[in-house]
Each structure stands twice: as C-alpha cells, then as structure tokens.
C-alpha cells in the first residue's frame, strides 16, 4: 500500500489515523482512500458510498483491488490484548483532516478469527465507531463458542445508525423514520439488559403498541420492531420457551427496568387476567412438614395442572422473584437454656423440638421465597397437629407420612407439656424474631426500591391473614404459648404493613422530588413560614436546643434547593437521627430517648404543616406527602438504630409491646436511667394520691391569671412529661371560672 502525493485533483496526502476509541472485544477497521491519480473514477464511486473520518484506521493489502460497487474488502488480525494494530510490514499512517468528535463509520460484514483459531462468521453485521466507543449492530453468530460482543446499551451514534439502516432496508418514509428516534428512546427508558432473564417477544410489542396508542404515534410492524430491539440491545438471543404446544419466542437477556411504569401495567394486566378466570374447585391439601417441591402442595386428585390460571400465577411469581432477596438465610437458633425438665420429658425431647422447629422454619422460608403464602397456614397446622373434627370450609386434610414422622419424633402430648415451660417460650420467641426478620428482608430488601403493585398487595393480604392462620392452627396449644407466638407474628405483620406503606409513599414522593417546578414552589412557600414562631410554640413541649432546630431548618432548605434525590434525602434523615441520638448512646435510656425523638420530630413537622395550611400554600399537597414519607422513614431508621444498639432484631424491638394483654403503664416506662422518670416517680411514695391530682388540689385557692404562670410552669409541666400522670390530668377535678374585681380566678370543685 502506498500514499501518493501527486494527483490532478488534489495535492494533499491521503493518510489515516489510528483509532483511539475501540473496544477490546472488536477490532475497529475502516476504509482508506486510494491514490486519486491511479483510480479517479473508482475513488469517486467509493467516496459516494463509504466515508473516511478521523480517529479510525484501516489496513488494506497492497495487492487488493478497489471495488466500484462500494463493497470494501477488509482483513482482520488475531490479537490477545489491547494494543495498536498495524501490518507486519509497512508503517502506520495518520490522517490530519478534520476534528469531528461525533462521527460514525460503517464496516461491512466480514469474517473474524478468534484467539483460539476458531473461525467465526459475522453476517449482516455493522461496526459503528464514535468517540464513545465501538458498537456491533445487528449481527448473528455462526459459531456461538466465541462471543464477539456482549450485551450492552447503544450509544447516540447507534440510534442514528439504526434509523438509517431501517430506512434503507425497509424503505421507510422520511416522516416515519423521524418518529423512530422517539421509539428508540422509549426502549432505552423502559428496558435494560440483564443476565438470565427473558421476555416474550409479543409482550414487548404489545407494550410498544400501547405506547404508540397513548402518544398517537404510528407504530412500525412487528418485524421492524424486532430490528429496533436488536439494534439497541446488542447480543440479544431468541429462545422458544414454554410447555409443548404453548411455547412462545422470548428475547433472552433483556428485562423491564425496575422503575419503569411498564411493571405496574404488566401487573395490572396479569391481575385482570386472573380475575376474569372462573373460580376453580377447592383443592385437597396435603400437609407438609418441609416443602421440597412447593407445587406438590397444590396438587389434588382429579385436578388438571397447566391451566391458564396456573400459568399466569407461575409467570407472575417468576416476575416478582426478581424483586426479592432470596440469598437471605435463617439465622442460627440458640440453645434452650433449661435447668429442670418438665414432668414426663427428657433432653432428647428438647433436642427433637429444636430440630423439628428448625426444619419447620426452613420450610416457611422456602414457601415465602416462592411467594406461595397460602401454604404457611398448612405448615402451621402440620407442626401444631391441627386436627378439627369437622373442617369449617369443607376441605379435606389428609394424613401424610410427614405428619406421622413428626408425631413419632415428638408426640403431641410432650409438645404441649414443653409449651408450658418458660424457657421453651423464651427460646421459641427468639427463634420467631430471627425468622420473621429474615422474611422481612427477603420480601422487602429495600424499602425505597420500587415494588410492583401486585406484589405489594399480595404482601399486605398475606400480613392480614397471618394472625388468624396461626391462632386457628394452635387451637389445642396452651394459651401462654399462643400469646407468645401471636405477639411475634403480629409484629411481623405490622412490619410488613408499615414497610409496604413506606414503599408506596416513597414512589409517590419520588415523582415530586424530581419535579423542578414543584421543588421551586415548595422552597418559596417554605421561606414564608415563620420558623421563629414555630420554635417558640414547640420549645415548650419539646424543649429542644434552639441552635439545633435552626441548623435543621437551614439544612432542610439547602437540601431542598439542591433538588436532591430520594436516596440523598434518606441519607440526610439518617444523619439527623444519628446526631439527635448520639448523646444517649451506651445508656440504658437509649430506647426511650429514641421514642421521645420520634414524638418531637412529628410535633415539629406538624407545626410546619399547620403554618403552611394557614397560609394556603400552593405546595401544601407536596409538603403533606413529603411529611408523611419522612415521618415514616424516620420511624424506620429509629427502629433499626434501637435494634442495633440493643443487639436485637427490629422485629423484636417492635414486638416488645406486641402482646396487648401485657401492655401496662409499668411496661411503657420500664427504661431505667431516665432523668424525667426519676424526678417524677420519687414523689409517688409520699402519698397514696397521684401527684397530678395533689398538685391540682393545691391550686384550689384562687389566683389571679398573672400569678398562675410561675405555678403552672413549676408544677403542672413536669407532670405532663410523664405518661404515668397523663390520665390523672385528664380526669382531675373539675374547675369553674369565677369573676372578681381582681380578674379571673379558678377554684376546684
């Protein structure tokens, strides 16, 4: 190959520049212009079809001829690592023309040789090079043993090239091709590449048709849409999946983005499909101690499997499982600390109980991971030997080998005896807290991550049924054990309801935080709030440091002005919580201080909302939504922080007062070390009469209004700070107002 400096048309040297933006997986090769003097007509023809741009290099053998039809013959060289490529003989050629950064060069289909010497035919493919990298468009592999490229997202140059390709191959009009850009952008906004997942081709096209219908766009046909998909998401493979007779073509390696609105659309469509199916007859359930194949629990005699409803449920469950964290495992259960054995039991019975309960909890975890919540009731009935004489719903419960095995390992009589022992109660409660915490982290691994509405509704229905299922399954178990178990499962159900509500609020608030006009309006309305008045009113109740409150106000406005994301707001709230509770770390009063902080936080936020309401702020709705989210997320943060400090699980923290029968004023103030508690409780022993009532009686003498303020501050206010005395303040002796020459006076009746 040579570079001539002579020519009748141009006197400049035609040179080439090596590529600096190419992927290691695909060598970039581009066309070199030939000397103008030798092949004037041929060069003119080539220039009309192929273009040479800076930032690329092409190697052409000296003996190669130039084809006038635009088909460029190229040669590739095997390599093992990223480097500058050149011929074995000859030098590198550089081009100094132009400096465009957004250029695209097309190389026709050619053969490639892998590093292992395997011939790979790439047919119908195009290489697109730009400043962002090199992309392979619309290729197919004859040898799947070596992958030329990996599935990746297209660059802007790829989008432009895809439009040109479709316009040339399908003969699209200029008007229709101009619409392809919006179609391609819609694909990039709603889909992403992922390993090990697939989507039916018909589903993608139906989503596309719905998008075109909503935006009044002219859709392309299914074949052209398939080309769009492959031009944007390179390396996609097509598979035929499904049962025999019902298989469909799927794109393998692509999925709907978690935050895409198509997720909600897909869930709603599946839900409506299930609602339109006729109700099947009730199936006969076979109780299981541990579920190896969860589908077996739903199979009854005379029932046909593989129906459309079952297929819909299976597809929905598989889609939902990508939102779960199936890597969670049960924590290790501790040993039972028991000093004396109950009558009629041995240590072997206790070991059998530990082993059986561990297997029982593992079966529950397996069922939850597979989203088959209805099996939980059957598992509970099997473990607790539920045996009603006449089932209320007419279902038939069949004795199984698993139930016989459980009975042989630990008879029901011994199970009931062990359930009465305090050590067994405490051990099983700790096991439940650990298991339920693992289930929460499986179902809702991130409270801020979008969750499909159908999955959220399924979790809430599951939480609503838990207490009834467990109470019904334990109908023959001692009442003390039932109370312990129900308290734990109630905390679990409450946590699921709170977290799903928090997730729903997070998705609603995310849209507000991403709206620039709404953020500006919120900031304008917030600057009109009289925070000095808010602090003056709240300080009497909360007694917070003025400097800290002012600092929080400044930080909140600054974070709002920066248009922070939801995740950045979450980090800010966590920092506020850590600073507020830092003085109480390592002290026994930490849990109570955390609860007091929640009350103060809620009181301050309600005062701000009240001011916005009175001012008829235009952004009141946005502030109300944000306030609900931040209050709920602060509750979430405090809950986990208390669990971390106390060494317990969040479920255990919330289940501390889960048993309503055990709640009493003494339990509510059991935290020791509280300064407020020590000051208010020391006077209770001096008189049999409650302190609040005694203080109110002492005020029976008439005082002018101006003289009562110091008395109220010194006497009534400390009582308000203690929940023990709140009921006495409400039910204290009535007073009547009397008018006198000196002013209004109050006398006890």
Curated annotation (Swiss-Prot):
One of its GO terms (molecular function) is sequence-specific DNA binding. Residues 183-258 bind DNA. One of its GO terms (cellular component) is extracellular region. This is Transcription factor RFX3. Residues 674-687 have a biased composition (Acidic residues). InterPro entries: DNA-bd_RFX, RFX-like, RFX1_trans_act, WH-like_DNA-bd_sf, WH_DNA-bd_sf. Heterodimer; heterodimerizes with RFX1 and RFX2, and RFX6. PROSITE patterns: RFX_DBD. Disruption phenotype: High rate of embryonic lethality. 2 peaks of death are observed: approximately half of the embryos die around days 11 or 12 of embryonic development. Of the embryos that survive past this stage, approximately two-thirds die at birth. Surviving mice are systematically smaller. Their body weights at birth are approximately one-third lower. This growth retardation increases with age, and the body weights that adult male or female mice attain are less than half those of wild-type mice. Mice exhibit a pronounced defect in nodal cilia: cilia are present but remain markedly stunted. It is found in: Nucleus. GO terms for biological process: cell maturation; cilium assembly; cilium-dependent cell motility; determination of left/right symmetry; DNA-templated transcription; endocrine pancreas development; epithelial cilium movement involved in determination of left/right asymmetry; negative regulation of DNA-templated transcription. Keywords: Developmental protein, Differentiation, DNA-binding, Nucleus, Repressor, Transcription, Transcription regulation. PANTHER family: RFX TRANSCRIPTION FACTOR FAMILY, TRANSCRIPTION FACTOR RFX3. Belongs to the RFX family. Residues 688-698 have a biased composition (Basic and acidic residues). Expressed in ciliated cells of the node and in the ciliated ependymal cells of the subcommissural organ (SCO), choroid plexuses (CP) and ventricular walls during embryonic and postnatal development. Expressed in developing and mature pancreatic endocrine cells during embryogenesis and in adults (at protein level). It comes from Mus musculus. Disulfide bonds: none annotated. Residues 663-699 are annotated as: Disordered. Transcription factor required for ciliogenesis and islet cell differentiation during endocrine pancreas development. Essential for the differentiation of nodal monocilia and left-right asymmetry specification during embryogenesis. Required for the biogenesis of motile cilia by governing growth and beating efficiency of motile cells. Also required for ciliated ependymal cell differentiation. Together with RFX6, participates in the differentiation of 4 of the 5 islet cell types during endocrine pancreas development, with the exception of pancreatic PP (polypeptide-producing) cells.
